[in-house]
């Protein structure tokens, strides 16, 4: 059974950039719902497998993708944020960003633009293309998980579902995106980058 991971900081730790009310609802209600629904879906899937019921297996796949993706995405998202975040990455990750995007500022602009441009709900991502050995920006709709749908390894995810910002930023997604850069945990993103380069 999947379980809701603990946050590595308090709900109010990312204020003023993301307020405690948003963090509490986002983690304890939204992420928890993905986890619960994923467990229920996997149980039904096991039953369908045991019966050899392929039609039922296919019917369950959208729920598996949505709730499984929601669990994967949020588990990455919480660790990508930190009350001691912000600034720029250092070392190899910064070098790779400069190599693949020209500069850190250009990278920030591109990831912000991709995230602002998500229609409806979804995610903006910095991913690693293992085949090319390059960093890549991508946007995914809904809860589509980056690696499962594009093959890119997720390094940094920005949640642009309205539940991630509406209580504080209303419908002004660009203001939320401007603020989130102040709490990006570059140590975590760097760890992910170093791990996928091995």
Curated annotation (Swiss-Prot):
Gene3D superfamilies: Fe,Mn superoxide dismutase (SOD) domain (1.10.287.990), Iron/manganese superoxide dismutase, C-terminal domain (3.55.40.20). The keyword Protein biosynthesis does not apply. It comes from the Eukaryota. It is found in: Mitochondrion matrix. Mn(2+) binds at residues 26, 74, 159, 163. Its EC number is 1.15.1.1. One of its GO terms (biological process) is cellular response to oxidative stress. GO terms for cellular component: mitochondrial matrix; mitochondrion. GO terms for molecular function: manganese ion binding; superoxide dismutase activity. The modification N6-acetyllysine is found at residues 44, 51, 90, 98, 106, 178. The modification N6-succinyllysine is found at residues 44, 51, 98, 106. Keywords: Acetylation, Manganese, Metal-binding, Mitochondrion, Nitration, Oxidoreductase, Ubl conjugation. Destroys superoxide anion radicals which are normally produced within the cells and which are toxic to biological systems. Belongs to the iron/manganese superoxide dismutase family. This is Superoxide dismutase [Mn], mitochondrial. It comes from Macaca mulatta. The gene is SOD2.
